[in-house]
Design a protein with these regions (language model features):
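A short beta-loop-alpha structural element at the N-terminal edge
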Residues: 4-30
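Conserved acyl-CoA
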Residues: 123-129, 152-168
């Protein structure tokens, strides 16, 4: 079935975040993040009303953040959403400061800051104050996953990046990484930036590495990462991926011969 990706409107806030919370609640990494950011839960009517009102207020003030909805063209139902910041001009250090987590306090706030500080720091090191597109959130209702809605959402943002000539940056999860990879995103090499959340902070058995990913727009070669042209880094990623694929094929052949 065809999916439409459109700018979200004010009446879409609640259904967009219905898809968001449903998707994150059923994803292993997403559920951990929800527990850290919203430790009191996300299902109560009181929370959802406050969240919707807070989102509406943010929409009235944000100058860079855009929300997209993915619509089932047969039913008109909103089944997914994407939230991205579009930074079309350079930003100062003051403009790039991490917002405070004002709704949390004490140990809960400290825990959330330990998680978000690492993500914020990595993004700062990779992209800095340069113009780029940042995919802040991406979700498809679990009932509609695996049918092309996620691909449609990502493609819409890829098209945006190509149109305005800006790279796209995001923090993926282990379950979403392949969706982005198929659209041309590649992981940032660990020597440039790496985020590993400690198990003690997440409440997991093992540390968790976050896939940091970048997609270059068509024809962009002058954006730099740590003083290097992103085009050069991109070529390295492509070569590394090619070598990995060759190694995987060799291992498969060896296994078949055994």
């Amino acid at each position: 079935m065809p999916y439409l990706v459109l700018p979200a409107l004010i009446p879409d806030i609640r259904p967009c975040y219905d898809a968001y919370f449903a998707a994150f609640s059923t994803d292993p990494s997403g559920s951990i993040l929800l527990d850290i950011l919203f430790p009191s839960g996300v299902t109560s009517d009181e929370f959802r009303k406050a969240h919707t009102n807070g989102t509406l207020q943010w929409w009235h003030t944000s100058e860079t953040q855009y929300t997209y909805k993915c619509v089932d063209s047969e039913t008109g139902e909103i089944i997914g959403m994407a939230l991205c910041d579009v930074f079309v001009k350079p930003r100062t250090e003051e403009e790039r400061k991490m917002p405070e987590i004002g709704w949390l306090h004490g140990e809960q706030r400290t825990r959330a800051e330990r998680v978000l500080d690492g993500l914020w720091g990595a993004r700062e090191r990779i992209m800095g104050g340069r113009p780029y597109v940042y995919i802040h959130a991406f979700a498809v209702d679990p009932k509609h996953q695996g049918k092309g809605a996620g691909s449609a959402l990502v493609q819409a943002i890829v098209d945006l990046g190509n149109t305005i000539g800006l790279p796209i940056y995001l923090e993926a999860t282990p379950t979403s990484e392949n969706v982005y990879f198929r659209k041309g995103f590649r992981r940032v090499p660990a020597e440039i930036a790496q985020v590993v959340h400690e198990a003690a902070v997440l409440g997991t058995k093992e540390d968790v590495e976050v896939p940091l990913m970048v997609k270059l727009p068509q024809g962009v070669y002058e954006v730099k990462v740590d003083g290097r042209k992103l085009g050069e880094v991109w070529a390295e990623w492509q070569e590394e991926r090619k070598q990995q694929q060759q190694q995987q094929r060799q291992e498969q052949v060896q296994q078949q011969q055994q």
